[in-house]
Structures are given as C-alpha cells and as structure tokens.
Amino acid sequence: MAANPIKTGATIDGFLVGELLHKGGMASLRAVTRPDITVPLLMKIPTMLEGDDPAAIVGFEMEQMILPRLSGIHVPKFVAAGDFSGPPYIVMERIAGQTLLRRLDDLPLPYAEVAAIGAKVALALDDLHRQHVVHLDVKPSNIVMREGTGDAALVDFGLARHDQLPDLLGEEFRVPYGTAPYMAPEQILGDRRDPRSDLFALGVLLYFFSTGVRPFGDPKGKRRLQRRLWRDPVPPRKRRADFPPWLQEIVLRCLEVDPVHRHPTAAQLAFDLAHPLETKLTGRSERMKRDPIGAVIQRRFHPDFAFAARRQAAAPRVSASSTAPIVAVAIDLAEGSEPLHEALRATVQRILETLPDARFACLNVLKHHRIAIDTTLDEEGRSKHLTRLVELKQWAQPLAALQNRITFHVLESTDPAAAILEYAQTNRVDHIVMGARASSTLRTLLGSVSQEVVAKAACTVTVVRLPRAFDAGAGESPPATR
C-alpha cells in the first residue's frame, strides 16, 4: 500500500473517515463513524514512509492480534480491523478522557494524588495481566483516565506480548523495543515475558510524577540504557525532603533491578498505594543517597548471577523430539516459483498431519545490498516489507488447517542464509523446510542458501526439490529471498 492513503471524507469498509486527531511517528489517529454504531470511534492507521523501521509494521500486526482478545473498562473496546492486503487499520472505542501526558506541566503532583493515580494504573495492569498480556510500554501518553469514573485505561499495544500468541517482535528483532525512560532491566536484556516489567515502568512514572524528575533520565543507545542494571537512582527523599517514607518504599521496590524483588503482582502494588499506612517499611524507605561507588562497580563487573540464572531458567525450551515443534518454512517469492510453492505446501501439510500441534513460521528474506543504499519503498511508494508480508500470507492461504498456528516474518539482511540460521537459533526452531535452487553452473561455483543452511543449522533441515522436468525453468533465486 502507499504511505498513509486514508484521507478525511473517505469511506473504508463502511467507516466514514473524519478529522485527524493525532499524527505520530508510527501511526495516525482519526475520528470515524458508522451508521450502526452510536459510540465515538477512533481509527488507528500505521504510517509507512521511506526509511521507517519495519518493527512498526510488526507492532501494528501484534496490536491487531491482541486488542480483539481484550475486554473490560481498562482497555479500549475493539470494533474492527483491516488487514495488510488493503489499507490496514484498527477501529476501536474513542475513550472520553485525557492521557496522563497532559499532567506533565503540573509536576510534581501532591503525594496523595500520585498514589491515587498509581493505584488506578496498577489495577488496570492487573486486569491486563489476568488477560495474559504484558504491555511493555507503560508511560503517560499510553494511560487514559476515563471521564466520569476516573478509571485508568491502557492504550497502544504495539509492543505488548500475549502469552498465548506468538511474540512476533521478540522473534523477528534482536534489539529491545520500548520507551527508554520506562524500560525495565530485563526488557533491555531482551526478556519480554515478565508482567513485573510493567511494574518497573509504573515505578518510573510514580517517581517522575512525585519529584518532577525521571529516575534514569532519557538515555539514548543501548549502553546508556543498561546503566540502570547497576546504577541505582537518586532516592526520592534526596530530591524532596518531605517525601513520605511509605511512598519511597513503594517506588524503590518497583525500581528493583531483579523482578523477584518487586511486588509479585500489580494487584499487590495497587493495595500498597491505596493503603499507605499498612505498607511494610524496609531499608528502602530510609535511603538518602545512592549506593557507594564500590557497590556500583561490583554490580557492573560482577553481576547478580542468580538474576541471570532465573532469566535463563525461565526461557522457553522446546525439544526437537517434542510433539509440538516449531517449524520454519523459508519461502522464495520470486515469480515463476509456483511449482516449488506447491511442493513446499505439500511438505508442510505432511508435517501437519504427522504433528498436529506443530507451530509454523513462514520466513522470507528481504535482501539488502552490501554497499549500495537500499530504499524501504518500491517505485509505487509501497512498503517493500509490507508487500512481502502480504505475499507470504497469500502463499499460506491454501493451508487453511493451520489458521492460528502460523506466523509470518520478513527478515531483512544482506545474507539470506545467515538470517535464516539466526532466526532458527534465536527462536529454538526444531525443523527448517526450504526450497532449493535449480541446478546451474552458478550454483555449483557459488554454493546455495540451502547448502549453507543444511551445513550450519543445529536442527533438522528438509530441502524440497522439484523433479528435473521442472528444474530448467525454476530460476536462480535463492530460497527465502529474491
């Protein structure tokens, strides 16, 4: 699709597009109406321009998967969505109320008000966590206080993780995603599974709203982000002499590096914020200065191995002999590959019949030049990444039996084989299925992607070849790239 083609006055799937309400780096928000719906509606439309991060597309896809599964007053009600084969969008309830971003000019807020806001946000997080979702981007602009009731509602689930859905962001990208001031240490290290990451972010918000200062600033780059793993923040009582010990106890507990030392649940955090006199005080409540430099050096160069061990133990492990393996299917989308496509689909179908609980990940590599400058849009202004994603989904349409057990990933790399191998290793893939190049002198001299994957993969690899009758016209494109 072309970049952001939806304009005021357009009709999309029965929705009349109204005024532009907000335009951000990754998406725009527009008011929409439909004759059969009387409540105010909001349409979220991804922005895809030259040079945009493909993670924005994947994040939008995740939000389309997660939002329909959520319910209750603490999230916007899902109405409809348009997939990537046409103009992609999400239509949801337009919540009446203001985001906490509007309160920044009033900081620092009274302590009682900070605690009241924090308790409401913690209750919203508890409701979200009970629905199997970690938000992973809790910040003032993503929290709306509903008019009338004052309940907190969480918005923007582009970085969220649902523990019953594939984590497309975590599988496809190796860099941490989030908003720098609010990211939890484990999130920076690539762990997106822990609900207590949201409690850390809420702790940052509580510190900020009660002191007017962000505890870790607004760091740029991963190295500066990682400082919070070993450098503790200035205690709030150092910044404000009248800061209540009970509130410092709660805030610094939220900001513990190891999640095990934070509140076990958002509900317990909400209880403490609502009952300050019942909060059990520890040494945290008395701190007036940061840890001495010796302790910082110890944490920096001799980290808490128990923390690392717990994170490693929590990592999902799937044995190659499991009855529910992860199968990666590397697909060449070049024109003229339909006979090979049919053979690949037939192979996938046989695996599905043998292992009905298998999960499939369809891969395609968008190959970048090693020296030349690549563009993210094609000659018609469409996102190359998005076009490949749509083509992958079209490839899988005949495999109707897969439905919710198949995901789609466009990898971007100068080396297709390396990209496939890295994906397989990172995501503990048990079986790779891919097509082979047609026989040729060039393939003999330079080798092939399939040969490299077979030689280096740590899992089973099935290479699908066409009978020689098809080989002559099969082309020279490597698997999973073009």
Question: What residues fall within each predicted segment?
Answer:
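Conserved short submotifs of the Hanks-type protein kinase catalytic core
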Residues: S85-T99
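AlphaC helix of the eukaryotic protein kinase fold
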Residues: T47-R69
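Activation segment signature within eukaryotic-like protein kinase domains
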Residues: I117-G118
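Protein kinase catalytic-loop region centered on the HRD/HxD motif
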Residues: L123-V133
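Glycine-rich, Arg-bearing micro-motifs that act as flexible, cationic patches
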Residues: H431-K456, F470-D471
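Activation-segment/catalytic-loop signature of the eukaryotic protein kinase fold
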Residues: A81
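Small/aliphatic-rich secondary-structure junction motif
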Residues: A320-T375, R482
